[in-house]
Amino acid sequence: MRIYLVRHGETIWNTEGRIQGWKNSNLTEKGIEDAKALGKYLRDVDFQCAFTSPFQRAIDTTKFILGDKNIVITSNDNFRELNFGTWEGRVFQDVKAEYPEQHYNLWNKPEAYIPVDGEYLEQFRERVRQGINDVIDSKYDGNILLVTHALVVKSIYSIARNLPVDKIWDTPRIGNTSLTIL
């Protein structure tokens, strides 16, 4: 099994510096073009199936990557981004000003992060781990496309490397439409 792990394309909120989480923001033209370009790059890969987060930005990215390929796309709730609770839709700098300790903890001491009506990182990682187990336990054993979100990719990477949650930010930067192959 080979998993082609992709972060969704650039969104409007990405360009505005807003926290997305479970709230959606549409792809920008750049996000669409980047997804199509990645699809062109991967055109010779014979995907058995595609898994995606249920959020529209990930679904759209998946469709643009696959183009006219007739591939089964399965949405899996376990591949949703971290639920940032009341921070969602807000600009990072505003959240930092209003919740300085929790903002600091999220980025510097993730094990101490206490979400405001959102999801703890340990809960999130267990959800992502279950999603990966769903893929591994699926009937597919060839090339699999998985389109999801930055923190999900970081979590999968850290899980694969047996890193604790406090090392989640020590993983590589995950840009929009980036590709990681497992």
Which ranges hold each PLM region?
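Loop-to-helix element that buttresses phosphate recognition and phosphoryl-transfer chemistry
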Residues: 4, 10-61, 115-129
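Short amphipathic alpha-helical segments
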Residues: 17-18, 62-64, 157-160
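Active-site-adjacent alpha-helix immediately C-terminal to a catalytic or transition-state-stabilizing loop
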Residues: 59, 130-181
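Short, basic/glycine-rich phosphate-binding loops at helix/coil junctions
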Residues: 15-18, 101-115
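Short coil-to-beta-strand
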Residues: 1-10, 101-104
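Phosphate-coordination/substrate-recognition cap region in phosphate-metabolizing enzymes
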Residues: 39-103
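Glycine-rich, phosphate-binding/catalytic loops in enzymes
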Residues: 21-23, 66-69, 91-92, 161-165
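Short coil/turn segments at beta-strand junctions that form active-site/ligand-binding loops
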Residues: 1, 46-48, 140-144
